[in-house]
């Protein structure tokens, strides 16, 4: 169900540019997120999604443009200001200390560190870690005593997400490819967490190449391409095929490009698919010759 928006967005980027030398990573980006809104952020690799998230979390300063938080333009905006605004990110490349145990990673955030730490802090940290993991990902079977480096990638992803959810004043949660290693069951548990956060007024920016997931969970979809806004849409009004087309994927289906196969053809035709349309596929043409190595790439979905 579409959420009613307040007049003022909680976070707004206005005409934001980001340059790395002469390379233009972001160009005239306008981005708004309202309280309780779930935004699906999509685009190919290199579109500028991660750069924009680093600006939102204060890790990178914009070259120019405005960052507005709760109606106030920020004259200074670093990780400190982002944290005070309640913005937290569960990173795709993970921010965990791999040499520490699971509970020690959590303890780094919720235990007062000093010369005279309270007695029994380890026992408390272990209990809180177990409770937190079970709250968001029931039956996760994660051994909190294990060093993070010995966990599976899926377990690390769960720990990263739960650690981010510990943020006391959480107002905006950024999830960067959060289900890339998760099973369907664990992904569904995360979707439930996102729904609960949204109902409480916490905004979520959900970055994923899994387009069916984006359509399922988002209130609004924002698209990026080549460092620019390339449009937005209502997920209730489109399907996966239409979203792929909006992202620029239709060119491959509609274009009647001629490919010179003289160099590629190392032998006789091994597989040939012509104008195939089926479930989730549209007008597929594929020709593979014996001895040929064919790379296939694209967005999930």
Regions found by a protein language model. Give the residues of each.
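Glycine-rich phosphate-binding loops of nucleotide-dependent enzymes
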Residues: 2-301
């Amino acid at each position: 169900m579409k959420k009613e928006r307040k007049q003022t967005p909680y976070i707004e980027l206005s005409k934001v540019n980001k340059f790395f030398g002469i390379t233009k990573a972001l160009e005239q980006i306008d981005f708004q997120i309202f309280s309780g809104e779930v935004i699906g952020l999509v685009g190919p690799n290199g579109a500028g999604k991660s750069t924009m998230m680093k600006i939102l979390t204060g890790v990178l300063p914009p070259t120019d443009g405005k960052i507005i938080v709760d109606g106030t333009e920020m004259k200074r905006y670093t990780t400190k200001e982002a944290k005070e605004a309640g913005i937290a990110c569960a990173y795709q490349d993970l921010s965990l200390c791999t040499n520490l145990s699971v509970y020690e990673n959590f303890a780094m955030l919720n235990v007062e560190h000093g010369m005279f730490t309270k007695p029994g802090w380890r026992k408390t940290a272990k209990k809180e870690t177990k409770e937190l993991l079970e709250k968001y990902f029931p039956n996760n079977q994660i051994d909190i005593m294990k060093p993070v480096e010995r966990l599976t990638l899926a377990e690390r992803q769960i720990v990263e997400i739960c650690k981010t959810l510990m943020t006391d004043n959480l107002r905006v949660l950024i999830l960067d490819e959060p289900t890339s290693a998760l099973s369907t069951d664990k992904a569904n548990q995360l979707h439930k967490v996102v729904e609960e956060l949204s109902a409480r007024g916490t905004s979520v920016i959900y970055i994923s190449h899994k387009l069916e997931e984006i359509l399922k969970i988002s209130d609004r979809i924002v698209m990026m391409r080549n460092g620019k806004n390339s449009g937005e849409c209502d997920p209730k009004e489109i399907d996966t095929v239409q979203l792929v087309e909006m992202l620029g994927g239709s060119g491959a289906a509609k274009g009647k490009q001629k490919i010179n196969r003289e160099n590629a053809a190392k032998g006789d035709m091994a597989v040939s698919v012509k104008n195939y349309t089926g479930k989730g596929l549209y007008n597929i043409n594929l020709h593979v010759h014996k001895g040929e190595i064919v790379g296939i790439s694209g967005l999930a979905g």
